[in-house]
Amino acid sequence: MIFFNFKLNRMICPIFFLYIINVLFTQYFIKCEGNKVTVISHNNGHNDNLDVNKNGVISQENVFDTSESLNLPSNKKVGSDDLNTTTISFTVPDNLENEVKVVSSSESGKGATVSHTKVTSEGLSDTQPNVTQSVSSSTHTPGSLDSTMSTEQHSSVSQSSLPTESSSETLNKATVPEIPIQINSGLLKNYNGVKVTGSCGSYFRVYLVPHILIYALTKYSVIQLESLFNDNARIDVEHKGELQNKCSEGYHFKLVVYITHNVLNLKWKTYKPNEESKSEDSDVRKYRIPKLERPFTSIQVYTANSKAGVIETKNYNIRTDIPDTCDAIATDCFLNGNVNIEKCFQCTLLVQKKDKSHECFKYVSSEMKKKMNEIKVKAQDDFNPNEYKLIESIDNILSKIYKKANKPFEISKDLINLEDLDYQFKNELLEYCKLLKKVDTSGTLEEYELGNAEDIYNNLTRLLKSHSDENIVTLQGKLRNTAICIKNVDEWILNKRGLTLPSESPSESSSKSDSYLNTFNDKDKNEDKDDMSKNSKEEFKNDDKENSDDQNNNDSNKKDDENNINNGDTNYVYDFDDDDYDNNSYEKDMYESPIKENKNGVIDLEKYGNQIKLKSPYFKNSKYCNYEYCNRWRDKTSCISQIEVEEQGNCGLCWIFASKLHFETIRCMRGYGHFRSSALYVANCSKRKPIDRCEEGSNPLEFLRILDEKKFLPLESNYPYSYTSAGNSCPKLPNSWTNLWGDTKLLFNKKVHRYIGNKGFISHETSYFKNNMDLFIDMVKREVQNKGSVIIYIKTQDVIGYDFNGKGVHSMCGDRTPDHAANIIGYGNYINKKGEKRSYWLIRNSWSYYWGDEGNFRVDMLGPKNCLYNFIHTVVFFKLDLGTIHVPKKKSWKKNVYFLRHNTDFMYSLYYNNYEPETSQDFESENDYDNAFVHGQSDESDETNKEGKNVHNSVEKKIQILHILKHIKDSQIKRGLVKYDNINETKDEHTCSRVNSQDAEKYEECKKFCLTKWNECKDHYSPGYCLTDLYKGEDCNFCYV
């Protein structure tokens, strides 16, 4: 027996010794495979795959966020056809508050305990996270109430050593950023819902994909719901009554969101740390959700840390309603930061050369299927030979105009001197202008004398100095500005200014056009009264009638040249003006009226949306246009986005182009669709002498007078614009021409205020609002939301020229006498170089697409403190009754919409609302919330003086951002990271920062190729596919751009 034991011991000891070695050496076994570093942890059966992404940042895949035993799936690439996906089923828990979570991924600050992976760092920047990684093991400590059994990923960043904004360091190291976001979120174990906890003062969003968005501005204890299935109707949780739980400094909050029996439940609670059980009962709100064609598929939580320069998106998968293969492609697009998952999904199918019979094509839009053959044609095949040559010439000039051309383009910003121009480069400049003249359709270079090589060099370098921070994509577009080739470039702008102010009253009017529209008699009054009475009786008999913000340009919307028959597939639109509102309370009128709940305390979201629609059918709180942000041109499916930038040429007809754009946006908002109207018709039907039409200015009053007298406005295609023809006689009207004016009537404003009121026309001078600019801003926002745009009068002389940089935000003063008419088409928020939160107007000019930022520019709403006049001298809007038309009915939800798509400002506003200025305020009262989105004046004005001279530099701060994305499914986390050199890139539907390379060393090459070739592919239906086709290699993936 002893012998047996001895032999057994001799056998067991080596085995035990080998087991100990195996445990020690395989605790963290690192496997290198290409650019992927896989860290396999055998602690408790967890497998952490750390992928070095395109920026050199390690991302973790297959991190199991639970302490339960799990069957590990085999490692597969995202997008592989055999990736397994399962559906989680949910039941209602008996006690929701004590329910254990399956998944919790939280960032709770420095010093938090972690399990399996602990990452520490030194340093923090306002703009850029960049920390090194260390790996260790630790044991998770469960909390008390609502504690989880899950493994949690905690984050922390200290505040010292991250590179500053001006630092040359980037995120090209293998790093895992630590996120001091004080928001924790987790998926409820047996329920369709999440719990979000954190410190009061943060701003976050919860998205129940694809139907409901929840906004939480905890600093003001404001929680709002937006129902995406019902025209984006937004409701405040305090509709039912004031919240009992209020956030204060030092308090924490808890928000529980879950769905049961088609009812959305919200539970909100605030408490002092470690005193949650002692705090008051939670505020509870319930909302009934209508039966929807598509179920809820995931819950997303969006958070941001402005100091660390981090935005985080977590996607908790609760249901998969598409095949695993297709879901894997969509997940891959999500993890690479794509804002339009459908386009990325389509591009991936094309690049992978999937057959049309493939199951994933069921989830592709019908529009894409129709354009399949078009997509497979290279973008440049549509170019004429001169376009090829011009593109090549621009690239050559940009490669030679900088001294350090041998370095990467973005680093090389030193321009060569005039004496450095050699004979070959001079010829290149001359040839460039000849090509530009051939492809230019505005006729500008036909009118002006072309400059010599020295003139062109001076004009070009002046423009490049004004755009020193822009990338090659922007500069390629700027070099299509024809002004660069003019000998005396300052003459380019002289005839583009053409505004004269109207008189303030009929008695002071020296112009027939002024007095004509001031005439308002009892007959007009009675007609308007009858029309309004008729409209109010018949308006919106059908609840399905839709606002035209989402209306496509569709021939069925024509009034005169199309035969629309009401066969049950269309609704009537009865148009009337909707301007009679109290500027101080219109938001309250629209969104804060009492809402009835049923006996169980449940509010019906569908009924509420219909109620809002009936209150103001044209006032739509769209995700592309709301009180905080508005840019309908970003929504490529909208009617307004089809309105192109105009080029008035060498003629002072800015007043016509500003007026016609305003008229066209009103038509879009009223459901008439977009049909480009003829500016030349208005110009040539003016009663002024032909020789004066381009040289003497006018204003929107004359625009209305001409059309009201003629009762006709043809299409642009009927009577095309050429500024050289703006001296001809008023044309005779062929029967084949379309009349866009139709039955339009001018209405008279009945409210008394500080404005110039004319028939069909109202104007407000900012000087009257000097002590109450918030009222002015509210009024303008209202009009832009309601009518799509407003007309503005501004001063451009010695302020705005051909080289004006429209990319940034300018803080400029105005002048007593404006000289130019343009349009405000949107607005938004930004952070200036001093770290102050500010707001801007988005302005559309009529100086061509290649001027400013694709024809637009942004201006601070309030401007510098020392201004005598605001940059916006006057705002003008029309009051029109357009009559009635037929518009197609639209279903509440498209069956082929399967993928996430936010508006382009979604990430920026998330960051902005979490941003705390350096002169941060303490917790404000709830009454301060009303002014939270319009921010005051600062001393910052760059090169601005009281008269507003020569402003070129942007006052907007450049902020680098790291976007961390987490996809949580079956208790498994997959991560993606995208770095943006400027947070404004998150506003772009496409950006080369999202290119991907299997070889990390090839990332910069892929990004540079994308930037260089972008202008060739940007108008292609699938730019990612176009870039892939041009690249020909296999190292780059462009579908994520």
UniProtKB/Swiss-Prot annotation:
<feature type="compositionally biased region" description="Polar residues">
    <location>
        <begin position="114"/>
        <end position="149"/>
    </location>
</feature>
<feature type="site" description="Cleavage; by SUB1">
    <location>
        <begin position="937"/>
        <end position="938"/>
    </location>
</feature>
<feature type="glycosylation site" description="N-linked (GlcNAc...) asparagine">
    <location>
        <position position="459"/>
    </location>
</feature>
<comment type="similarity">
    <text>Belongs to the peptidase C1 family.</text>
</comment>
<dbReference type="GO" id="GO:0016020">
    <property type="term" value="C:membrane"/>
</dbReference>
<feature type="site" description="Cleavage; by SUB1">
    <location>
        <begin position="105"/>
        <end position="106"/>
    </location>
</feature>
<keyword id="KW-0325">Glycoprotein</keyword>
<keyword id="KW-0378">Hydrolase</keyword>
<keyword id="KW-0472">Membrane</keyword>
<feature type="glycosylation site" description="N-linked (GlcNAc...) asparagine">
    <location>
        <position position="84"/>
    </location>
</feature>
<feature type="region of interest" description="Disordered">
    <location>
        <begin position="101"/>
        <end position="173"/>
    </location>
</feature>
<keyword id="KW-0788">Thiol protease</keyword>
<feature type="compositionally biased region" description="Low complexity">
    <location>
        <begin position="101"/>
        <end position="111"/>
    </location>
</feature>
<feature type="glycosylation site" description="N-linked (GlcNAc...) asparagine">
    <location>
        <position position="130"/>
    </location>
</feature>
<feature type="compositionally biased region" description="Low complexity">
    <location>
        <begin position="150"/>
        <end position="168"/>
    </location>
</feature>
<feature type="compositionally biased region" description="Low complexity">
    <location>
        <begin position="502"/>
        <end position="515"/>
    </location>
</feature>
<dbReference type="InterPro" id="IPR038765">
    <property type="entry name" value="Papain-like_cys_pep_sf"/>
</dbReference>
<feature type="compositionally biased region" description="Low complexity">
    <location>
        <begin position="564"/>
        <end position="574"/>
    </location>
</feature>
<feature type="active site">
    <location>
        <position position="654"/>
    </location>
</feature>
<feature type="compositionally biased region" description="Basic and acidic residues">
    <location>
        <begin position="521"/>
        <end position="545"/>
    </location>
</feature>
<feature type="glycosylation site" description="N-linked (GlcNAc...) asparagine">
    <location>
        <position position="984"/>
    </location>
</feature>
<feature type="region of interest" description="Disordered">
    <location>
        <begin position="500"/>
        <end position="577"/>
    </location>
</feature>
<feature type="active site">
    <location>
        <position position="820"/>
    </location>
</feature>
<comment type="function">
    <text>Cysteine protease which plays an essential role in merozoite egress from host erythrocytes. May cleave host SPTB/beta spectrin and ANK1/ankyrin-1 which disrupts host erythrocyte actin cytoskeleton and leads to host erythrocyte cell membrane rupture.</text>
</comment>
<dbReference type="GO" id="GO:0020005">
    <property type="term" value="C:symbiont-containing vacuole membrane"/>
</dbReference>
<feature type="glycosylation site" description="N-linked (GlcNAc...) asparagine">
    <location>
        <position position="554"/>
    </location>
</feature>
<feature type="glycosylation site" description="N-linked (GlcNAc...) asparagine">
    <location>
        <position position="583"/>
    </location>
</feature>
<keyword id="KW-0732">Signal</keyword>
<keyword id="KW-0865">Zymogen</keyword>
<dbReference type="GO" id="GO:0006508">
    <property type="term" value="P:proteolysis"/>
</dbReference>
<protein>
    <recommendedName>
        <fullName>Serine-repeat antigen protein 6</fullName>
        <ecNumber>3.4.22.-</ecNumber>
    </recommendedName>
</protein>
<dbReference type="Pfam" id="PF00112">
    <property type="entry name" value="Peptidase_C1"/>
</dbReference>
<feature type="signal peptide">
    <location>
        <begin position="1"/>
        <end position="34"/>
    </location>
</feature>
<feature type="glycosylation site" description="N-linked (GlcNAc...) asparagine">
    <location>
        <position position="684"/>
    </location>
</feature>
<dbReference type="GO" id="GO:0141030">
    <property type="term" value="P:symbiont-mediated perturbation of host actin cytoskeleton via filamentous actin depolymerization"/>
</dbReference>
<feature type="site" description="Cleavage; by SUB1">
    <location>
        <begin position="380"/>
        <end position="381"/>
    </location>
</feature>
<keyword id="KW-0645">Protease</keyword>
<dbReference type="InterPro" id="IPR000668">
    <property type="entry name" value="Peptidase_C1A_C"/>
</dbReference>
<feature type="active site">
    <location>
        <position position="845"/>
    </location>
</feature>
<dbReference type="GO" id="GO:0008234">
    <property type="term" value="F:cysteine-type peptidase activity"/>
</dbReference>
<dbReference type="InterPro" id="IPR000169">
    <property type="entry name" value="Pept_cys_AS"/>
</dbReference>
<dbReference type="InterPro" id="IPR013128">
    <property type="entry name" value="Peptidase_C1A"/>
</dbReference>
